[in-house]
């Protein structure tokens, strides 16, 4: 596992955006051989999307031959709802780049058969071989995507019941009213994430510090699904200084020295 300990959330957004651009450009995608990118929603990746849009507008990257798969979607929320993840992705990213609509893959939380929808999603991912880079965030309780504590580390795309803690955290997007937050979501599984060629997780803020500690210094534990990154041969965690508050000083210093060359020019 790589840990990139940066100063603040703005730096996390810039570093992660540059990393995605480097991976896409090095891959040299074509229509027949697209770059497959996994994407999250939430407040943490907003800086990354902002930077990616800026880099695209500067002519330094194209998304014409990029295929995307999003991590999750609420069940029962209309696609047009302002807090649906469909709306989030189009408003904050897709509407501002040159990606082809047919290359955008999002789970349908209103599918008449959600189990069939989850199987379809897994099959669509498999049809591309693998996801080249899956970017994600993490919850305060260490969940990645909507793989809540005690999720199987071998899980695939499925419907999940959201914990009260997650619904309380997400109520800030629903005028602070937890009753408006859906109780269920469709989500890729931990196993789905681990199948990706590379996984990059963004961790910002003191509230995520226990989750980061579990990921980096803890043991692999299904109560902290982020800890499954330890099983991945090519995982990278990009964090800010407040998120490192529960890590040992020597741990942070070790990774800071190790990644010094990769943290220049921010």
Curated annotation (Swiss-Prot):
Record GO terms (molecular function): glucosamine-6-phosphate deaminase activity; identical protein binding
Record-linked Pfam families: Glucosamine_iso (PF01182)
Alphabetized SUPFAM superfamilies for the sequence: NagB/RpiA/CoA transferase-like
Activity-regulation annotation: Allosterically activated by N-acetylglucosamine 6-phosphate (GlcNAc6P).
Keywords: Allosteric enzyme, Carbohydrate metabolism, Hydrolase
Reactions catalysed, as given in the entry: alpha-D-glucosamine 6-phosphate + H2O = beta-D-fructose 6-phosphate + NH4(+)
Enzyme class: hydrolase
Active site: 72, 141, 143, 148
Gene Ontology CC annotations of this record: cytoplasm
UniProt superkingdom: Bacteria
Pathway noted in the entry: Amino-sugar metabolism; N-acetylneuraminate degradation; D-fructose 6-phosphate from N-acetylneuraminate: step 5/5
InterPro entries xrefs: Glc/Gal-6P_isomerase, Glucosamine6P_isomerase, Glucosamine6P_isomerase_CS, NagB/RpiA_transferase-like
An annotated GO BP: carbohydrate metabolic process
EC number of the protein: 3.5.99.6
Site (Part of the allosteric site): 151, 158, 160-161, 254
Transferase keyword on record: no
Keyword Hydrolase: yes
Similarity comment: Belongs to the glucosamine/galactosamine-6-phosphate isomerase family. NagB subfamily.
Subunit text: Homohexamer.
Function in brief: Catalyzes the reversible isomerization-deamination of glucosamine 6-phosphate (GlcN6P) to form fructose 6-phosphate (Fru6P) and ammonium ion.
Protein name listed in UniProt: Glucosamine-6-phosphate deaminase
Species name: Edwardsiella ictaluri (strain 93-146)
């Amino acid at each position: 596992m790589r840990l990139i300990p940066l100063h603040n959330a703005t730096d996390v957004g810039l570093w992660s955006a540059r990393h995605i651009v480097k991976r896409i450009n090095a891959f040299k995608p074509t229509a027949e051989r697209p770059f497959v990118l996994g994407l999250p929603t939430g407040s943490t990746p907003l800086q990354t999307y902002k930077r990616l849009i800026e880099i695209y507008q500067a002519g330094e990257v194209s998304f014409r031959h990029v295929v995307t798969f999003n991590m999750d979607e609420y069940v029962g929320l209309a696609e047009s709802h302002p807090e649906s993840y469909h709306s989030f992705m189009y408003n904050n990213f897709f509407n501002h780049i040159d990606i082809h609509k047919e290359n955008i893959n999002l789970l349908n939380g209103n599918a008449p058969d959600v189990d069939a929808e989850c199987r379809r999603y897994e099959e669509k991912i498999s049809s591309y071989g693998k996801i080249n880079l899956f970017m994600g965030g993490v919850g305060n309780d260490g969940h990645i995507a909507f793989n809540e504590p005690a999720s199987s580390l071998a899980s695939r795309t499925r419907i999940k019941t959201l914990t009260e803690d997650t619904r309380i955290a997400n109520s800030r997007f629903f005028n602070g009213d937890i009753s408006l937050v859906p109780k269920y979501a469709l989500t890729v599984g931990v196993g789905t994430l681990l199948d990706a060629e590379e996984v990059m997780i963004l961790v910002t803020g003191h509230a995520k510090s226990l989750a980061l500690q579990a990921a980096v210094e803890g043991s692999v534990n299904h109560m902290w699904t982020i800890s499954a990154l330890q099983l991945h041969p090519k995982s990278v965690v990009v964090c800010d200084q407040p998120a490192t508050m529960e890590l040992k000083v020597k741990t942070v210093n070790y990774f800071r020295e190790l990644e010094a060359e990769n943290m220049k020019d921010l």
